[in-house]
Every structure is written in structure tokens, then in C-alpha cells.
Amino acid sequence: MTYDVVVIGSGLAGLVAAASAAAGGAKVGVISTSSGNLGLWSGLATGPAGGGRDVAEALCFFLETGERAGLPYRRAAALTGFDLLAASGRKIRAVLAPETMAAGDLRGLPTAACGSGLLVAGFTELADYPAALIAAEARAWTGLAVNHRSLSLGREVGHGSGPRIARLFDDRTWFQGFLDAARRVLIAEKPWRAGMDTARPAAIAFPPVLGLFAFRDNLTALSEALGCPVFELPALPPSIPGQRFWRFWRHRLEADGRVTFHAGRKVVKTGVEDGRCLWVADELTRFQARAFVLATGGVAGGGLLVSPSAFFAVTADDGEDGRQDQDRWSVDPAPDTPREPLFDLDTAGQGPDWLTWGPRTDRDGRPFQRAGAEGGSEAPRSSGAGRRRKPLANVFVAGWLLGGSEKRPPDACLSIVSGWRAGRLAASLAAKPDGERGGDPR
């Protein structure tokens, strides 16, 4: 199969890269084993977005694509971002939030001294979001007036998981029954908290399981029925917002006609000649392209491999009497550095802090191979970090695979910005008749 650009990985960075490359006019193939780390994603874009033209353009592109996909995100009016309530009950700051969560900005809610406040709603069949615990932590950490109530979802759920409950919320008949129950349980005729002079909270937080597809209609119906703003909490794994994102963005990209997904496929071979990747392949098919985006995730996503022994290289320091002091633990240097398995890229990072590891790249995100790895995955592995050399001319790294630093670990903002830029550069390179890399397209 032949494409202009092949994206390896379909997590957040991979999807943004595919959308960006397609917007640049490229015919794009996406190869992935799964939806990447989206199943672990809270749904929020956290971390400092930073400044600069690239960041502004990337975030605008993300917001516009989300609107077209039917999964709108909101950017906070305040420069500091949204202050949202995490499932732990503590505050979490986000630069971007899905429409389903953005109404939960804590700065718009009254404090404990100001009457009605936030109601945390829980479901008795869903143990991942215990309303009483979340409310107690929120009162302690935010200073807001917070109460809680729980309601049952009925026998249809049993003790189901988040995905099972989300599918139930897509059932229109069942949801109408849930609306009636929510009115009775969450909005009582008498004051909903002792000492308050109103029966209605300022806002209600729900677990983020209000449907895989009908969530926007459900939130609107709940807000109208309950008479106050309603929002979802940031997600815990398995993430329903992450599943929504993958489904809605994939559908939009496929419907636009420039992106083809090869899901459930694992790249196991690469063909590199003269510093350029010519093809990648799974067990059955070879995919050729003029440019490639590598968005396979870091150590957690399988984009970097680490020897199991590296996770257990922990010892106790000897005390003054020569015995091991169990209160003075230290981490030995990792016996093996993380290895990038597809191109045998030269990697760097800070000891056993795996979030800091990633391939060495130039300023455009093009990675360097290790010495002796010119033949790609079919060449013999080198034994140590290779000398610096020219980067692969038509491969761009994006997302968590880039790694982070002690001060800033990888986050969703990094995935969005790096994915947008990698896709843009790959499309620009693929459009050149001679296939040679040009400068950053402006």
C-alpha cells in the first residue's frame, strides 16, 4: 500500500498528526494496534501550553477539528486555564477541556460561606467515582460548598464497568427513566443541604460515563431537568472520554476521505536506506510513503522498551553499622537504557525516570538512529548509545515518545502541539517532487 504520509500510532498525538497531514493535502495511512493511551486519558489537555505561533496554531487546529468531529473542546478565557475538580476531589488545571467538563470551572462556583454550591452525584453501581469521598476531599481542598448524593442505575447495570454504563446512557428509553429518577433524588423539594435556603445546587458533577455517543444531548437534558449547569468529572481508566475521542476523530478523518485506518495492525519491520525510511510493514502488508510520523508512545505506551530488571533496581543504603537501612532507599542506575524497537533510535533521558526518555531529535522532531542501525529494524542492534549523526530525513516523532523533563513530564498539550507539527512537516515533505526535506512550511 502506498500513501503520502504514514502515521504509526493512533493515540492523541497520532490522531492529531493524521488530521494535520490530511489538512496539508496528504493521503494518510494510520497503522495502530489500538487507541493508544486514550483509554488512560482524563480527557483534559493539562500542562503549560507555552507560547509561540506553533502552539497557538496547533491549539486552534485542535479546537476546529474537534468541532467538526462533533466533540467540541473549550479553551479557558483565563490565561491560567480551567480549575476543574478531579475524581480525587482535588483541583486540576487544564488548558483545554471537552465541552462536557468545561462547565465545571471551580472559579465560577460559590464558596462554603455563600449558600448553595456543588453537588457531586454518584452511581451506586460504579465504585470508581465514590461521591461521598470526592465531596469530602473537595470541601477540604477547594473551600467550596460541596455535598453529595448517589442514585442507582437499576438492575440493567448490575455492578458494571464504565463502558457498560456509558452504553446504557445511549439508550433513549432507559435515559428517560434515569431523568425521572435524577429529578427525585438529586433535586428535592426541601433544601438539599441542611442550613441552605435553596433546593437547587449551583452545579452538579457526574461521573464521565454519560454516553459514548449521546453524551451532549444527555447533558443538555439533565441541565434542563435539574435546573442548573451539569458537567462530567475528568476520567479515570478505562476512560470514556478517551474512547469518545478516538471514535469521533476517526470517523471525521475517514469521512473527509484523506485518511485510512489500519487498526489492529502492528508494525514489526522498517526499511531504511541512505537515511530515509522507504516503508514499514506488519506481518502481512508493506506500507510505503514519502514521510512517516512515529507516535507510538513512551515506555507506558510501548514505543520504548525497557528491560524488566530496570524497574526493580532498588536497594537499601548501608547504615553506619553496616546493616541495610530500610528508611534510606536508593535507585541504582538502570542496567539498560530504553530502546526504540522500530528504527533503533538513539535515546536519552534521566536515569530511571522513564517519562523523561525519548529519541534524540533535531528541532523539527526528526530522530537520530544509533550507530550501526542504518538498515532499520532488519539491521543488527548496536550495543550502546550511538554517536550523533544526521537524522532520518523523512521521519518525525510526536507525542509522549518525545519524552519530557523533570520540570515538565509529557502531557496532552505536548501531544497536540507535536502531533500537529509532525503532521504538517510530513505533509509538506511528501508534497515536494524531489522528496527532499525543506524548511518549516510557513
Where are these regions (language model features)?
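Conserved N-terminal glycine-rich FAD pyrophosphate-binding loop of Rossmann-like flavoproteins
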Residues: V30-G51, G158-A166
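Core beta-strand elements of the Rossmann-like FAD/NAD(P) dinucleotide-binding domain
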Residues: M1-Y3, E283-A291, P391
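A conserved FAD-binding loop/helix module that cradles the flavin
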Residues: A19-S20, G302-P308, L392-N394, A398-P433
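Short hydrophobic core segments
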Residues: V6-I8, F287-V299
